[in-house]
UniProtKB/Swiss-Prot annotation:
Role, per record: Shows a broad spectrum of activity against both Gram-positive and Gram-negative bacteria. Also has antimicrobial activity against S.cerevisiae. Has insecticidal and non-hemolytic activity.
Major place of residence: secreted
Family (UniProt): Belongs to the ponericin-G family.
An example Gene Ontology CC term for this record: extracellular region
Species for this entry: Neoponera goeldii
Cystines in this chain: none
Name of the featured protein: M-poneritoxin-Ng3a
Segments passing through the bilayer: none
Protein localization: Secreted
UniProt keyword list: Antibiotic, Antimicrobial, Fungicide, Secreted, Toxin
GO biological process: defense response to bacterium; defense response to fungus; killing of cells of another organism
Superkingdom of origin: Eukaryota
Amino acid sequence: GWKDWAKKAGGWLKKKGPGMAKAALKAAMQ
């Protein structure tokens, strides 16, 4: 489910940093 995806994304974003988070959010919004 989306909650599992959110957990994975959260851990990944902590490693990758805020710049990647912003890019991912932009991609998700489209």
